[in-house]
A protein has these predicted regions:
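Conserved N-terminal substructure of TIR/SEFIR domains
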Residues: 1-66, 79, 83-91, 99, ...
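Glycine/threonine-rich flexible loop motifs
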Residues: 70-77
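Conserved phosphate-donor/acceptor-positioning beta-strand/loop module used by diverse small-molecule
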Residues: 96
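Glycine-rich, charge-decorated loop segments at or immediately adjacent to ligand/cofactor-binding or catalytic sites
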Residues: 101-114
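A short helix-turn-beta junction within AAA+ P-loop NTPase domains corresponding to the substrate/partner-engaging
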Residues: 117
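Short acidic-hydrophobic, aromatic-tinged amphipathic segments that line or gate anion-handling sites
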Residues: 122-127
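Short, amphipathic alpha-helical "lid/cap" segments that border enzyme active or binding sites
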Residues: 130-139
Length: 165
């Protein structure tokens, strides 16, 4: 049985939503099945569906935009809950530092999620080098977990469909 999703994207809505949506688009164009709560949770059943999606996806991608972890000191913070669930589930965690905006782990971040500081960030350039940096992240971080895609389709600079194999 195959998973419904390859990648779950976790992000802080303020400061991270635009990065998460671009990552979802780029990864989907390359053949990955991506869960993004903004698109998937239209009916308001939040917690149960979030946890089910994290459980389904082998990769947990964490968008570390500026101040992304500031509210993780609160027990009821959803980004914190998502990170904890991914850690407990043994997911491959891929922190993404968009445009080098992440300002680091603060002392008030709970020890239970502090282990993400030991994981190397994937720095994604959301400017002209977007495609190149996403492809590098795929090669270095996703393919070892998810394997090769039979056909990874995405658009080249001209907007034409391109094939990467």
């Amino acid at each position: 049985m195959s998973n419904k999703y390859d990648i779950f994207i976790s992000y802080r809505r303020v400061g991270g939503a635009q990065y998460a949506r671009i990552l979802q688009l780029m990864l989907s164009q390359r053949g990955y099945r991506v869960f993004l709560d903004y698109d998937e949770l239209k009916d308001g059943v939040f917690g149960k569906k979030i946890k089910a999606a994290i459980q389904e996806a082998p990769v947990f991608m964490l968008v570390l935009s500026k101040n992304a972890l500031d509210r993780c000191k609160n027990d009821d913070d959803w980004v914190r809950e998502e990170i904890l669930f991914a850690i407990e589930g043994g997911k491959k965690i891929v922190p993404v530092n968009p445009d080098k905006t992440f300002d680091g782990i603060h002392e008030q971040i709970p020890k239970s999620i502090r282990e993400i500081t030991d994981i190397q960030n994937s720095e994604i350039d959301f400017g002209q080098a977007l495609g190149v940096t996403v492809d590098l992240m795929i090669t270095d971080r996703l393919k070892p977990v998810l394997g090769e895609r039979a056909s990874e389709k995405h658009k080249d600079e001209d907007g034409e469909a391109a094939q990467v194999t």
